[in-house]
A protein has these predicted regions:
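Generic beta-sheet signal
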Residues: 53-57, 137-141, 187-189
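Phosphate-binding/switch region of NTP-binding enzymes
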Residues: 164-278
Length: 348
């Protein structure tokens, strides 16, 4: 009997296995969304997507955090027709229309209202404990940033005006306990969170809830935004995903996603910045864009900015060039960036 076999036999834990054969490394489910640059932000690859583990979407109010969470959860449920969403709700700001917008059948959503961190902790751990690895479940928490601790609520009931030092500790415990379950049972958890500005001459956004979230999360996004204007009229927003932490993507990467009032998320937004930087597209004249033949240098038909948001503009680039590899090298950990991504292209 080899040393490996002896150690494996002596282990008291049922999931012990050789690393190269471990299902926790070789059978990781990764579900793509319909938005290529969201897949890049999650995994570093256009063909990647939402993976098991904790993903935190943080930002100020009205920064599309819940919608990003539902977009990912909707993709998971579309990919797995038998999947169920476990939706923990402390904000009650997601009407039925939000779910329908992302193709989510609300009869497959278990809605659990919560009022404090301890309620969330006890219920979530209880649910995860009873699930099997083959159960297809996606968990969404909206939001942890708005959750009080049980002590804070009790103090308010008893008219005590004292500082609450237990909330960060409770959140740290919640994610410390849930992280192994998410990995071992192949479950993605998407948590919406808030940010605050640190004090200083050059303040930066800080994810609320303490350091426990940073330790446990596989992905942390801090979401910013710019107005999408036509003249003086606001048509929507250019949201910028700032990758604060990732197991797959280079930290501090900035990925823009455009959302309009009328059409919702522009699926192919964010790609133009990369294509221009890598030479897969050019700007032949002000306000016009075109694809470029990589072998001959021939410039394709010119289109306006709106035309670059159409599938027809990108299909030839993905099919006939190495643009996917370029994006992977640009954003994924373990590769050297090929170009500097400073500019975010917006409609002129």
């Amino acid at each position: 009997m080899s040393i490996m076999d002896k150690l494996k036999k002596n282990s008291k834990l049922s999931h012990t296995s050789v690393l190269s054969e471990s299902k926790f490394f070789t059978e990781k489910d990764m579900v793509p969304t319909d938005v290529p640059m969201i897949n890049v932000a999650l995994s570093g690859s256009v063909d990647g997507g939402l993976a098991p583990g904790l993903t935190v979407l943080a930002g100020p109010s009205k920064h599309f955090k819940t919608s990003f969470a539902l977009l990912m959860a909707g993709a998971y449920m579309k990919h797995h027709p038998d999947a169920v969403m476990l939706f923990y709700d402390s904000e009650f700001g997601s009407p039925d229309s939000y779910f329908k917008q992302f193709g989510i059948d609300t009869s497959r959503v278990l809605h659990t209202p919560i009022t404090n961190v301890e309620e969330l902790k006890f219920d979530l751990i209880g649910q995860l404990e009873e699930l099997d690895r083959n159960d297809k479940v996606v968990v969404v928490i909206d939001s942890i940033g708005n959750l009080a601790s049980k002590k804070e609520l009790e103090d308010a009931k008893n008219e005590k005006s004292v500082a609450d030092m237990s909330r960060a500790k409770a959140l740290k415990g919640l994610f410390r306990m849930s992280t192994p379950y998410l990995a071992m049972k192949n479950i993605p958890l998407i948590a919406v969170n808030h940010t605050y500005q640190e004090i200083g001459l050059f303040p930066k956004a800080i994810v609320s809830g303490g350091t426990g979230i940073y330790y446990s999360a596989d992905n942390i996004w801090i979401i910013g935004r710019q107005q999408d204007k036509k003249g003086t009229e606001i048509q929507g927003y250019h949201f910028v995903i700032n990758v604060e932490k990732s197991r797959y993507v280079k930290e501090k990467s900035k990925i823009p996603i455009t959302v309009s009032w009328e059409g919702g998320v522009k699926s192919y937004s964010g790609l133009l910045d990369c294509a221009l930087a890598g030479g897969y597209a050019v700007k032949p004249s002000n306000g016009w864009y075109a694809t470029v033949d990589q072998s001959s240098g021939e410039v394709g038909p010119k289109v306006r900015y709106d035309g670059t948001l159409d599938k027809s503009f990108w299909d030839p680039i993905f099919a006939e060039t190495d643009f996917k590899d370029f994006l992977k090298k640009q954003y994924s950990i373990g590769h050297q960036s090929l170009v500097e991504m400073d500019e975010i292209v917006v409609e002129e």
